[in-house]
Every structure is written in C-alpha cells, then in structure tokens.
Design a protein with these regions (language model features):
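Acidic/histidine-enriched segments that form metal/cofactor-coordinating
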Residues: 2-7, 87-145
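His/Glu-rich zincin catalytic helix
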Residues: 1-88, 122
Length: 148
C-alpha cells in the first residue's frame, strides 16, 4: 500500500508569516594580530562552517585574472599534500570545501561535521598557510583540458 501525497499545483500555497523570528547574535573575537572572528553558535546542528573572507576580489588585482586564479587554485597542493591528497582527506571526513570571488571579496569556505572539525581545520591550515601551486598539478590540469 503506497501513500501518495497530492499537491494541487493550480493553487498557490497559503503564505504564512511567522510570529517570531529568532536570529542568534554573532559573537566577535579578535586575534592578537587583529583578525576579526565571528562565531554564530548553533550546536544543535552538529555542523561547522568556517569561512575565510579576504578583501581580494577582482577590483583589487593588479594583473587580470590573478585573484580568480589564486583562489581557484588553493586546493591544488600545499607544502606536503597534493591536490588529490587534499581532496581525499576532506572526502574521508565528509568535509566540503568551496571558494568564491566577486569584485570585492574572495571567500574560502570549509563545512564539516563538528566531530571532525579539528581534522578539517588541519587541512584548512595547510591550504591557507602552506600553499604551493605545484607545477606538476598545473601541467596535469592543462593536459586534461587539452584532451577535452
């Protein structure tokens, strides 16, 4: 016996405006070097989202495509990890990595389960602080594009 839910698509659903909307207040911290850190606690979700936001969008670059190339190649290797190792490590912990860029900002985001935050943070540290753009990785990507 199968229960099927039928939606009447010819009628727009009723709009419901919530009586209250609770938005938790972010806490601001500063590191010794003056970097601002904003924390929006929501422990009930068991997920951590860590975003690094840089004033480094396309309007700040002196060489065309420099900002885009830099942010898009961040996961291509670190001092001691290849792009594949980075991807496998993040995948192993179910972590997610994304970059975005606009005219004003470059954003690097990591999302992971709270219980794997320390492991994901270690990979993030390597990507953000020990970054290298290994020539072998760049050549490999270029040859893949040529084959397509």
């Amino acid at each position: 016996m199968e229960n099927k839910i039928h939606f009447d698509r010819s009628r727009q659903p009723e709009t419901v405006i919530p009586e209250r909307l609770e938005v938790p207040e972010a806490c601001e911290y500063r590191t010794a070097s003056g970097v601002r850190i904003y924390v929006l606690p929501a422990p009930e979700y068991g997920v951590v989202r860590l975003s690094f936001v840089f004033r480094a969008g396309s309007s700040w670059q002196k060489v065309p495509f420099c900002a885009s190339a830099t942010v898009n190649n961040l996961a291509e290797g670190s001092r001691d990890m290849t792009a594949r190792q980075i991807a496998e490590r993040l995948d192993y912990y179910g972590s997610w990595f994304d970059v975005s860029m606009d005219r004003d900002w470059s954003v690097v985001t990591f999302v992971c389960l709270s219980k794997f935050f320390d492991k994901t943070l270690e990979v993030a540290r390597r990507i953000m602080l020990e970054q290298e753009f290994p020539q072998e990785e760049q050549i490999g990507r270029a040859s893949c594009r040529e084959r397509v």
